[in-house]
Amino acid sequence: MQNIFLAATLLGAAFAAPQNPPTSCSAAPQPTGTGSPGTVCGSTTFTNYTVKAGDTLGAIAKQYNSGVCDIAKVNGIDNPDYIKPDQVLSIPANCVTPDNTSCVKPVPVITNTCVLGVGSTYTVKSGDSFSAIATSFNITLASLEARNPQIPNYDLIFPGQVINTPLCPNSVCDSIGTYVIESGDIFYNLAQSNNVTVGQLESLNVNVNVTDIHPGDIIILPHNCHNITASA
């Protein structure tokens, strides 16, 4: 009988003892961004990716089965054509409905045949083509080819080669000075805000890698290049 009472006492004590609440596992931190898994393109997860030299959003999107515009949206990228090495991106991976079009602006028809103010030569870089160079100066391909009759094959150019760009007569820049790169600067935005082209910036900064600039770097920066009216 004593054993029965002892067992009952122990059993009651077991039920009466306070139970420790279950320990919850903290969720893994999510990469920073403006969306969350499931709200962007139907993605169920975000992945951090550090941009390398030569990367494009298109290639990164393809690698992670994402969308160019989805990545741009999450990371606050205004121009999907311009990302910088060492930039950390939050990638919505395995998109159900990837968006590759909504953020892409229509390509403007280029009709200019000369460059305003400055930039009469350009030094070819690895990966360049005549077409890409013409676009960077916002001039037609035909006008760039016409300025370089010394080149026998426009499809065969090499790094370090200097080509001519057609400079507009009676055109000037309001100023040409130095500029110290600040955090967040990219060449495309600097060109737009100073009313010049990326090609002009590249032509004046031959030894600068335009996709890999850092705060404190010093570049040559023209401002507001334009046509002038000849004096009467």
UniProtKB/Swiss-Prot annotation:
The organism's place on the tree of life at top rank: Eukaryota
Molecular-function GO terms, alphabetical: chitin binding; lytic endotransglycosylase activity; PAMP receptor decoy activity
Alphabetically ordered keywords of this record: Glycoprotein, Repeat, Signal, Virulence
Database matches in InterPro entries: LysM_dom, LysM_dom_sf
One Pfam family in the UniProt entry: LysM
Disulphide connectivity of cysteines: none
Domain LysM, chain residue ranges per copy: 47-91, 120-165, 177-221
GO biological process entries: effector-mediated suppression of host pattern-triggered immunity; effector-mediated suppression of host pattern-triggered immunity signaling
UniProt KW Repeat keyword: yes
Knockout or disruption consequences: Severely compromises virulence toward wheat leaves. Produces no to only a few pycnidia.
SUPFAM superfamilies documented for this protein: LysM domain (SSF54106)
Stated induction or repression of this protein's expression: Expression is up-regulated during wheat leaf infection.
Cross-referenced CDD domains: LysM (cd00118)
GO cellular-component term (any): host apoplast
Signal peptide: 1-16
Glycosylation site residues: 48, 100, 138, 195, 209, 227
Remarks, miscellaneous: In plants, chitin acts as a microbe-associated molecular pattern (MAMP) that is recognized by lysin motif (LysM)-containing plant cell surface-localized pattern recognition receptors (PRRs) that activate a plethora of downstream immune responses.
Family according to the record: Belongs to the secreted LysM effector family.
Domain comment as written in the entry: The LysM (lysin motif) domains are small globular domains involved in binding chitin in eukaryotes. Mg3LysM contains 3 LysM domains.
Function: Secreted effector that enables the plant pathogenic fungus to manipulate host defenses for successful infection. Binds chitin fragments and blocks the activation of chitin-induced plant defense responses. Protects fungal hyphae against hydrolytic plant enzymes.
UniProt name for this protein: Secreted LysM effector Mg3LysM
Organism ancestry: Eukaryota, Fungi, Dikarya, Ascomycota, Pezizomycotina
Gene designation: Mg3LysM
